[in-house]
Each structure stands twice: as structure tokens, then as C-alpha cells.
Amino acid sequence: MQTNLLKPKTINVEQLGHNRAKVALEPFERGYGHTLGNAIRRVLLSSMVGYAATEVTIAGVLHEYSSIDGVQEDVVNILLNLKGVVFKLHNRDEVTLSLRKDGEGVVTARDIQTPHDVEIVNPDHVIAHLSQGGKLDMQIKVEKGRGYVPGNLRRYADESTKSIGRIVLDASFSPVKRVSYTVESARVEQRTDLDKLVVEIETNGAITAEDAVRASAKILVEQLAVFAQLEGGELAAFDTPAGPRGSATFDPILLRPVDELELTVRSANCLKAENIYYIGDLIQRTENELLKTPNLGRKSLNEIKEVLASRGLTLGMKLENWPPAGLDKR
């Protein structure tokens, strides 16, 4: 009698438009479509890392219940519009940006001055309208975070750094705007009682829909891993399984060659020159170690970090008992 549970053999990703996609997986055993679909949906809505404006200082404004001469919107509406700007920070957790504009016209997210490692996904988003003689001068603090954090929580926590005119915002960090899932019927040979899981997701553009699904699955795997270690005492780290060499089980992605990361030819050749053939080899290197690699500069390093981050990995991770026995080091 067959006792092994079926795992999906078919994965289909359908782009539905800008920042929208539909991911379909089949077949699942009966009931697993709802079990996994609901879990992924909840993680996508609550636990994705994103970026948001958290504090604002506007020249000449002491509090949010003010108006500015020459600006059509009052401060409350300016702040509401600012919350709609989608930021993306590369290799940093926070940044303070400046916006200065005067004269008649529309103020958009494009007017925010950004360094090279900060990206504005929707530069045409309108923040305010200036009339003749109007001026808007503001400092915007953008931070990396997870979920939704009300401003009053951070306002009291940061009381020691409070300054006159500092306006603390409610921050919605989640890059996921909408998620829904459906479970359809699937068939394998004579079995017709199987599930097909279809997840439809829309993001704000700071992360692709496919990467969001991958990240949510990674979170679920890490959280559920502790249930496999119910022996009491300290829990072994998921990424560093203990045991004699050859007995450890690693995340399958770590056993894949670095070629699957689809890095530029320059970056890939630099890694191979340092005997880095597998993703598990790569994540154990630190930034400083990679920067010492001949011909591998900061641009290549940033590329590597972004590709790893899209898969829920970082540099500087520790893996005990690596490499596993029998791994071809070429």
C-alpha cells in the first residue's frame, strides 16, 4: 500500500499584470491545499519584510495638524500621500532622505533626493501641489521592518530622541497588498480526490510576487523545523544541523551550484576561482572575504547579496558539518 504523501510535481507561475501573479501547484493530498494555502496566505500578509516612511520633519511645521502657505494639501494629507510612496533599500536598514521643492507645480516621489542604494518604485506618486510662491522642505526617515507598527508605539519608545517638529508615522512595512488562494481538483492517474493550490498575490513592487511566495515558504519551513526537534533542551539551529559528518541534512537549496543563482559571468567566475561551487559554500563567506577576491568589487558583492536575499539567505551564515559527505567539489 502506498504510504508516501504526494508532493507537487507541477508549478506554474502566470503573470497577471504589474506586480501581480498567480502561482499554481499540484498535486497535493486531499486537504493539504487548504492547510498550506491558508498558512502561506497568513504569512504573506503578516510577516513579509518591507520598507516604509516612519518619521517626517517639515520646515516650519511643529505638528501634523498644521497647514503650509502655498501648499494645497494640509500636513495630514501630505503625510497620507507620503505613506503611498514605495521605497526599496539595498544593503541598509534605514536612511534619511530630503525633499525640497519650491514654485508652482506638483510634488511627486521623484523629487525625493535618494542615494544610489535607495530606490523609489513609484516615482510618479503625487505627494502635494504647490501654488505660486509655495515651498516644501522635508526630511523623511525610511526604515526596514515587518508588518504594521503604529506610530504611538515608536513615539513612546523613542522619547529620548524626540525633537520639536518630529512627526512619527504609522508604518505599514508589508510589501504584499492582496493575497487570495483557491483549491481546485487535481488528478493523478486513477486518483481524482487530490488538490491543486492556486495562490494569487499582488505586491507594491518592492518585491516580486514570486519572491514573496518563496520568502513566505522559507519562513514556514524555519518555524516548523523546531517541531522536528522535540527532545527537550536547546534547539539546534535550522541552518546548522548537528551530528557527525554525513548525517546532517541541509536545506536542498544549499546543495545547488552557484550557477543556478544566474549571476553575471564576472561574478560567477570570481566565485569559482575561490573554489566556491555551491550555494552552501557561498553563504559561509563574509563580505570582507569576498571583497578580497581578485576582480570582485562592491557592485558584484551587492549583486550576490541581493540574489541571496531573494532566496532568504545571507552572507556570513554558519553551517556545521559542511560540506556533506559525497558532495562533488569539482
Curated annotation (Swiss-Prot):
SUPFAM superfamilies: C-terminal domain of RNA polymerase alpha subunit, Insert subdomain of RNA polymerase alpha subunit, RBP11-like subunits of RNA polymerase. Coiled coil: none annotated. It comes from the Bacteria. Keywords: DNA-directed RNA polymerase, Nucleotidyltransferase, Transcription, Transferase. The keyword Transferase applies. It holds the Pfam family RNA_pol_A_CTD. Transmembrane segments: none annotated. GO terms for biological process: DNA-templated transcription. GO terms for cellular component: cytoplasm; DNA-directed RNA polymerase complex. Residues 1-231 are annotated as: Alpha N-terminal domain (alpha-NTD). It is an enzyme of class 2 (transferase). Gene3D superfamilies: 5' to 3' exonuclease, C-terminal subdomain, DNA-directed RNA polymerase, insert domain, RNA polymerase, RBP11-like subunit. One of its GO terms (molecular function) is DNA binding. It catalyses: RNA(n) + a ribonucleoside 5'-triphosphate = RNA(n+1) + diphosphate. InterPro entries: DNA-dir_RNA_pol_insert (IPR011262), DNA-dir_RNA_pol_RpoA/D/Rpb3 (IPR011263), DNA-dir_RpoA (IPR011773), RBP11-like (IPR036603), RNAP_asu_C (IPR011260), RNApol_insert_sf (IPR036643). Its EC number is 2.7.7.6. Residues 250-330 are annotated as: Alpha C-terminal domain (alpha-CTD). Homodimer. The RNAP catalytic core consists of 2 alpha, 1 beta, 1 beta' and 1 omega subunit. When a sigma factor is associated with the core the holoenzyme is formed, which can initiate transcription. The N-terminal domain is essential for RNAP assembly and basal transcription, whereas the C-terminal domain is involved in interaction with transcriptional regulators and with upstream promoter elements. HAMAP family: RNApol_bact_RpoA. DNA-dependent RNA polymerase catalyzes the transcription of DNA into RNA using the four ribonucleoside triphosphates as substrates. Belongs to the RNA polymerase alpha chain family. This is DNA-directed RNA polymerase subunit alpha. It comes from Paracidovorax citrulli (strain AAC00-1). The gene is rpoA.
